[in-house]
Swiss-Prot record:
It holds the Pfam family HORMA. It comes from the Eukaryota. Belongs to the MAD2 family. It is found in: Nucleus. Present with 1110 molecules/cell in log phase SD medium. InterPro entries: HORMA_dom, HORMA_dom_sf, Mad2-like. Residues 8-192 form the HORMA domain. This is Mitotic spindle checkpoint component MAD2. The gene is MAD2.
Amino acid sequence: MSQSISLKGSTRTVTEFFEYSINSILYQRGVYPAEDFVTVKKYDLTLLKTHDDELKDYIRKILLQVHRWLLGGKCNQLVLCIVDKDEGEVVERWSFNVQHISGNSNGQDDVVDLNTTQSQIRALIRQITSSVTFLPELTKEGGYTFTVLAYTDADAKVPLEWADSNSKEIPDGEVVQFKTFSTNDHKVGAQVSYKY
């Protein structure tokens, strides 16, 4: 018998995916030094996760709020921008689109089991990890930082720590679309745009 995921479980799955994706991108792109990361097992993969307390807390605060918005159906996109510290210019824009699926339990064909979801997440994380093979090298060691944008509904409650921002698009950037994954309540797609 397959295990399906509830709304809370689906939201937790999506939020957890964001956590591992952010960590993976920050490591793979050299935004933080390799020694700030440790290996962990997740999704039957060996992944990297920061052990830097300040960075962990920052990511945790972001994802706690994103989790609340997802649970309420208020967040439809999460964006991680890698920014050149000197120029203030966005050099990569990692976009995760979230589609909220409602009323999906009317037939057995619509149920997404946990194993399928995890397999799709594995494929997506592998694509993110392998992106270093085609993305331009970020050459300024220690010269990059990141920011996270959340696209929410107009009526979403926004904490004071969050501020409105422009979309931080990369004009005339190259765009690479990645795979998607689905739960019973969410469909998540990813893409990266970058300066070439």
